[in-house]
Swiss-Prot record:
Family affiliation: Belongs to the transposase 8 family.
NCBIfam families hit by this protein: transpos_IS3
Other facts: IS1353 is an insertion seqeunce sometimes found in In2.
This protein's name: Probable transposase for insertion sequence element IS1353
One annotated GO biological process: DNA transposition
One Gene Ontology term of the molecular function aspect: endonuclease activity
Length: 514
């Protein structure tokens, strides 16, 4: 449900854009067309939108009330006939009007009783026990419980089966009453035990959700010993320790060992904070290997296994959902060139092998297209361009930026797929002027350009997929993508480069001045 501010923002933007429905939905990312039409109709009718739902209570005049009461008296004292004839009010309202205006005609329902209250199985058990152990009459027991005498005997029939009528004189040695009494007491004890067990299981789930931030659907047996110990400590005041340990399948010795460990100071407190900071500052996309490299670069040496354990305990998990790929293939405007790289994406020097491609990023506000050039030497994004249309200008401008970074004598191979952007005359003319050697993948074979596809995968799994892009405009998205690529070149750790970013690696090997 959209708030008042969201609905009013959508209507005002729609009017500001000249009542263009598609432009409004593309910029905001919400709502549906029918919802926006309904909001607009309400706004034009009231010059405002309702701030919430209000329950309207219908009001009747004194004349309407008197007319209904008179009709009831004149037409034979029938509530249904009066309501059908006049079309109002409800039966309860009409009865109230009769009591107020003509109380002498108000009818009292004979034999009415208090509303029926649902009784638990435990209450029924106790009532049946009292019935069988009574000294007085069954009516006295029924009055004490608050039910009728037939109801009491119905409970007995359901719980004990059909009980034969007792003879007026008790035979010697007849113990059926005592046996039923003992059976009822045993069943009552079992029900109380089962009730306590269910209460304990529910309390365990609630505490696991509260203390350990677990989902209510989690299986308590899948918790770690440390987490189980926290739950037991929180519930010891309410439930016996033995029952809690049994319910969580936790050995007594393990429980006291974990309690002892928790009293000791955590020697990884500082490391936990540093790991959490690194994870959050780097788009929540660092796994344990790059976290370990970042710690080493910061002068903090910790075992890789410790890093993995601490990340698991802090629940620092990289999310990697998948989306469909964008295809730029549009026929064969010019002949394709051969595949010169043949999936060899290793380069001994910068600016010898370049890769390029085009990808689509879709959010509620619309689509954005990213066109980069990746250097096979270290994965540096040499140049890139971001736009809202996958046209020739997007890729041609990107190529012009990349060519300006070349030094005299550098003429790399530029590899792409068979998309139409790389087969148009303007692209071919630019590559010939810069003396670049063109190379192309086979048709529909993404592994032939796997290194560039890998960059797109990292961009989407680290920046796009883990976040909610509702209410984000395309301009803001392009700004964030540009900032991500700068971070990718300057700060993002690559394990294959010794835990450095591409630019840091070039500084380290002397290929770029500081």
């Amino acid at each position: 449900m959209y708030s008042y501010e969201d609905r009013l923002r959508a209507v005002r933007l729609y009017l500001k854009l000249g009542r263009r429905m598609s432009a409004t939905l593309r910029q905001l990312g919400y709502p549906t067309k029918n919802s926006l039409k309904a909001w607009l109709a309400e706004f034009e009718r009231n010059q405002d939108l309702r701030r919430g739902y209000q329950r309207i209570k219908r009001q009747y005049t004194d004349e309407q009330k008197q007319r209904a009461v008179d009709h009831y008296i004149e037409q034979g004292y029938c509530l249904s006939h009066t309501i059908r004839s006049l079309g109002y009010p409800s039966r309860e309202a009409l009865r109230a009007w009769i009591r107020d205006l003509r109380p002498e005609f108000a009818r009292t329902v004979v034999g009415s009783s208090a509303p029926t209250v649902a009784r638990s199985r435990l209450e029924k058990q106790q009532a049946v026990i009292a019935l069988n152990l009574r000294v007085g009459s069954a009516k006295d027991v029924a009055d004490t419980v608050g039910v009728s005498r037939p109801t009491l005997y119905n409970w007995q029939h359901r719980l004990l089966g059909k009980v034969p009528l007792k003879p007026m004189t008790k035979k010697k040695g007849d113990t059926s009453l005592e046996q039923r009494h003992e059976a009822l007491l045993r069943e009552l004890a079992e029900l109380e035990s089962q009730n306590q067990r269910l209460r304990m299981e529910n309390a365990i789930l609630e505490k696991a959700s509260e203390l350990i931030k677990k989902d209510m659907g989690i299986n308590p047996l899948e918790l770690t010993s440390r987490e189980k110990t926290k739950v037991v400590d929180a519930l010891r005041v309410t439930f016996p320790l033995a029952n809690l340990l049994c319910g969580l399948k936790l050995a007594r010795s393990t429980y006291f060992y974990q309690r002892l460990r928790q009293t000791r100071p955590d020697k990884y407190t500082q490391v936990r904070e540093v790991i959490r900071t690194i994870f959050e500052d780097n788009y929540r996309c660092y796994g344990y290997r790059r976290i370990d490299s970042a710690l080493r670069l910061g002068g903090m040496r910790v075992s890789e296994k410790v890093v993995r354990r601490l990340m698991a305990q802090e629940r620092l998990v990289v999310r990697t959902p998948r989306r469909r790929r964008f295809s730029a293939y549009a026929g064969d405007p010019t002949p394709a060139v051969p595949n010169l790289l043949n999936r060899d994406f290793h380069a001994s020097a910068p600016n010898t092998k370049w890769l390029t491609d085009l990808t689509e990023i879709h959010i509620p506000a619309g689509k954005v297209y990213v066109s980069p050039i990746v250097d096979c030497f270290d994965g540096l994004v040499v140049a890139w361009n971001i736009g809202t249309s996958p046209d020739a200008n997007l890729v041609n401008t990107m190529l012009d930026h990349a060519v300006r970074t070349l030094r005299p004598g550098e003429h790399p191979v530029i590899h792409s797929d068979r998309g139409s952007h790389y087969r148009w005359p303007a692209w071919i003319r630019r590559t010939e002027n810069a003396q670049l050697t063109r190379s192309m993948s086979k048709k529909g074979c993404s592994p032939d350009n796997a290194a560039c596809e890998g960059f797109f995968g990292r961009l989407k799994t680290e920046l796009i997929y883990p976040r909610n892009w509702q209410h984000v405009t395309l301009k803001d998205l392009m700004t964030r993508i540009d900032a991500y690529i700068h971070w990718y070149n300057e700060r993002r750790i690559k394990v294959s480069l010794g835990g450095r970013s591409p630019i840091e690696y070039r500084h380290a090997v002397g290929l770029m001045s500081v």
